[in-house]
């Protein structure tokens, strides 16, 4: 949506909402919001955006890992990307999946979760649950914005948390 709404203290140029239907049968599920990507104009004061995000989420973490929902054809690896804090890149994360998944049900969760996360296997499940977070936020601008954004942006993503809620049903 092209917009000039104010988010995190600055006017935006575009806000994109991504929805996903987690019901694998398609019979009863409704799409749920899993990600919001916010693009800011070139002249936006991204230091203000970062400070406003710090008010909401606390200090930036040193790094976070996000897992993509898509793989390249023929690629069976777990598609992951690690974002490391820099002058123009701040990152936040919620609880790790390992902290919320009951240890006595880990195998059950892993078996079901494989249908939701490309490249996830028994071999990488433990590492995945340690690094994946219920929700993440990224504020990237200037030289750090590409390739996530074409320019200044914020990304709020909660796909793992949504899958967790679906699997625990």
Residue ranges and their predicted role:
Residues 1-28:
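Compositionally biased P/S/T/G-rich terminal and signal peptide-adjacent segments
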Residues 1, 27-169:
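Non-cytosolic coordination micro-motifs
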């Amino acid at each position: 949506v092209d917009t000039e709404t104010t988010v995190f203290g600055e006017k935006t140029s575009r806000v994109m909402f991504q929805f996903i239907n987690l019901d694998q049968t398609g019979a009863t599920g409704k799409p749920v919001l899993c990600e919001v990507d916010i693009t800011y104009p070139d002249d936006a004061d991204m230091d203000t955006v970062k400070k406003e995000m710090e008010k909401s989420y606390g200090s930036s973490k040193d790094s976070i890992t996000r897992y993509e929902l898509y793989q390249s054809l023929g690629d069976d690896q777990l598609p992951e990307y690690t974002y490391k804090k820099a002058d123009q890149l701040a990152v936040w994360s919620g609880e790790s999946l390992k902290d919320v998944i009951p240890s006595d049900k880990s195998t059950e969760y892993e078996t079901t979760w494989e249908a939701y996360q490309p490249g996830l296997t028994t071999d990488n499940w433990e590492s995945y649950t340690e690094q994946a977070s219920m929700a993440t936020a990224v504020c990237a601008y200037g030289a750090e914005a590409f390739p996530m954004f074409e320019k200044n942006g914020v990304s709020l993503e909660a796909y793992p948390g949504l899958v967790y809620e679906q699997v625990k049903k």
